[in-house]
Amino acid sequence: MEPESIGDVGNHAQDDSASIVSGPRRRSTSKTSSAKNIRNSSNISPASMIFRNLLILEDDLRRQAHEQKILKWQFTLFLASMAGVGAFTFYELYFTSDYVKGLHRVILQFTLSFISITVVLFHISGQYRRTIVIPRRFFTSTNKGIRQFNVKLVKVQSTWDEKYTDSVRFVSRTIAYCNIYCLKKFLWLKDDNAIVKFWKSVTIQSQPRIGAVDVKLVLNPRAFSAEIREGWEIYRDEFWAREGARRRKQAHELRPKSE
């Protein structure tokens, strides 16, 4: 009996914790639930339990990798913009043919000093290491930590077809959200309008891919046989296929309620 999604595992754990905290108020109910949990646990094979835990670990590491990637790009763009403005200011002050003077020169000098102090403080405070260095070493440090479990976190290299499909999905989804906003904001159309319904269906059909599309866990060939490694890949692919179908179905079912 496998959960439909990773969130269900946490829900089951919360239910178990709640039953423990509540205490033995009704003895018969506790015995019944305990017997039921024993039967459910006996029905789950050891391989399925291991694969389920790997799914939870993989999903958490995927979330962390995504957060670290966003953090790295945000502060990389920040430093790049600061460097660009600083270089332009330095050029205007010392390399232009016309001598800059007056208030313009004071503003340029203040800007250059402000950028220099900001960059120095950014390094001294450790923000450069936290936002640039550590995210770049995320995979190395993570794999050192999970090496004892004989698993490794690797990047998934998407094919050109997958990249093209992802780009089309992103553009379609962005256009659909913009059109829905404009139709409802400026034309005062309701949710039950046919045009609004069409663009909402576009947002549902153009949802991004889920699962092992960016990072994934691979098992160590020295510790796991080829059969177990193949079973893990199949288990994960089937899980995310069911999860994607469930999310699309849920989105379709929620549409009439919002309308």
Curated annotation (Swiss-Prot):
<keyword id="KW-1133">Transmembrane helix</keyword>
<feature type="topological domain" description="Cytoplasmic">
    <location>
        <begin position="128"/>
        <end position="259"/>
    </location>
</feature>
<keyword id="KW-0812">Transmembrane</keyword>
<protein>
    <recommendedName>
        <fullName>Sporulation-specific protein SPO7</fullName>
    </recommendedName>
</protein>
<comment type="subunit">
    <text>Component of the NEM1-SPO7 complex.</text>
</comment>
<keyword id="KW-0256">Endoplasmic reticulum</keyword>
<dbReference type="GO" id="GO:0031965">
    <property type="term" value="C:nuclear membrane"/>
</dbReference>
<feature type="transmembrane region" description="Helical">
    <location>
        <begin position="73"/>
        <end position="93"/>
    </location>
</feature>
<dbReference type="GO" id="GO:0006629">
    <property type="term" value="P:lipid metabolic process"/>
</dbReference>
<comment type="function">
    <text>Regulatory component of the NEM1-SPO7 complex which acts as a phosphatase and dephosphorylates the phosphatidic acid phosphohydrolase PAH1. Essential for the formation of a spherical nucleus and meiotic division. The NEM1-SPOo7 protein phosphatase is required for efficient mitophagy under prolonged respiration, as well as for reticulophagy and pexophagy.</text>
</comment>
<keyword id="KW-0443">Lipid metabolism</keyword>
<feature type="topological domain" description="Cytoplasmic">
    <location>
        <begin position="1"/>
        <end position="72"/>
    </location>
</feature>
<feature type="region of interest" description="Disordered">
    <location>
        <begin position="1"/>
        <end position="40"/>
    </location>
</feature>
<keyword id="KW-0749">Sporulation</keyword>
<dbReference type="GO" id="GO:0005783">
    <property type="term" value="C:endoplasmic reticulum"/>
</dbReference>
<dbReference type="GO" id="GO:0071072">
    <property type="term" value="P:negative regulation of phospholipid biosynthetic process"/>
</dbReference>
<feature type="transmembrane region" description="Helical">
    <location>
        <begin position="107"/>
        <end position="127"/>
    </location>
</feature>
<dbReference type="GO" id="GO:0016020">
    <property type="term" value="C:membrane"/>
</dbReference>
<keyword id="KW-0539">Nucleus</keyword>
<dbReference type="InterPro" id="IPR005605">
    <property type="entry name" value="Spo7"/>
</dbReference>
<dbReference type="GO" id="GO:0071071">
    <property type="term" value="P:regulation of phospholipid biosynthetic process"/>
</dbReference>
<feature type="topological domain" description="Extracellular">
    <location>
        <begin position="94"/>
        <end position="106"/>
    </location>
</feature>
<dbReference type="GO" id="GO:0006998">
    <property type="term" value="P:nuclear envelope organization"/>
</dbReference>
<dbReference type="GO" id="GO:0030435">
    <property type="term" value="P:sporulation resulting in formation of a cellular spore"/>
</dbReference>
<keyword id="KW-0472">Membrane</keyword>
<dbReference type="GO" id="GO:0071595">
    <property type="term" value="C:Nem1-Spo7 phosphatase complex"/>
</dbReference>
<dbReference type="GO" id="GO:0005789">
    <property type="term" value="C:endoplasmic reticulum membrane"/>
</dbReference>
<dbReference type="Pfam" id="PF03907">
    <property type="entry name" value="Spo7"/>
</dbReference>
<dbReference type="GO" id="GO:0061709">
    <property type="term" value="P:reticulophagy"/>
</dbReference>
<dbReference type="GO" id="GO:0019888">
    <property type="term" value="F:protein phosphatase regulator activity"/>
</dbReference>
